[in-house]
Amino acid sequence: MGVFTFQDESTSTIAPAKLYKALVTDADIIIPKAVETIQSVEIVEGNGGPGTIKKLTFIEGGESKYVLHKIEAIDEANLGYNYSIVGGVGLPDTIEKISFETKLVEGANGGSIGKVTIKIETKGDAQPNEEEGKAAKARGDAFFKAIESYLSAHPDYN
C-alpha cells in the first residue's frame, strides 16, 4: 500500500466562521441548495459526529451516483473538519481510502483561506492516477466556489 499526500488552498470572500457553518454544521441542507449536481446529503450511520457515514447523491453524466463520506474529526473551535471517502463512485478500485484534513483560517479583507491536505491510500503497489487527481481538485475547487456563491447570494444566512 502506498500513501500519497497533496496539499491545496482556496480563498474566499466569506468569513471563516460563516463558511465553516455552511460547509460543516449546515452541510446537509446547504450543499444540495448550493451545488447544482448534488441531489441530497443523508446520514446512513451515526449521529453526525466523528464516525458518522454520509451518503452524497449526485448527478453525473445524466446518471444518479453516490459517494460515502465518513466524518473522522470535527474541530469547531479551530474550524477544522476531517473526513474520508470510503465508498461509492468516488473511490476507484485501486484506492483503499481518500482522506481530507480541512481547516479554515482568516484571509484578506475578512475572507477565508481554506487549507486541505489530501491523503490517498492505494491498494497494493498502485499509483494514483494524475488525471483523476486533477479532476478531483477541479471538483473540489468548484464545490468550494459553489458554496461561496450561495452564501454571497444569501447574505442573511448566518
Swiss-Prot record:
Q: Which domain of life is it from?
A: Eukaryota
Q: Which GO terms describe its molecular function?
A: abscisic acid binding; calcium ion binding; cytokinin binding; melatonin binding; protein phosphatase inhibitor activity; RNA nuclease activity; signaling receptor activity
Q: In which residues is Ca(2+) bound?
A: 32, 35, 38
Q: What is its main location?
A: cytoplasm
Cited Pfam families: Bet_v_1
Q: Which UniProt keywords apply?
A: Allergen, Calcium, Cytoplasm, Hydrolase, Metal-binding, Nuclease, Pathogenesis-related protein, Plant defense
Give the E.C. number(s). Answer: 3.1.27.-
Compartmental location: Cytoplasm, Cytosol
Record's GO cellular component terms = cytosol; nucleus
| Gene Ontology biological process terms, A to Z | abscisic acid-activated signaling pathway; defense response
Family membership noted in the UniProt record: Belongs to the BetVI family.
**Protein purpose:** Class II ribonuclease (RNase). Binds to cytokinins. Interacts with melatonin.
Protein name from the UniProt record = Class 10 plant pathogenesis-related protein 2C
Source organism: Lupinus luteus
Q: What is the lineage of its organism?
A: Eukaryota, Viridiplantae, Streptophyta, Embryophyta, Tracheophyta
Which gene carries the instructions for this protein? PR10.2C
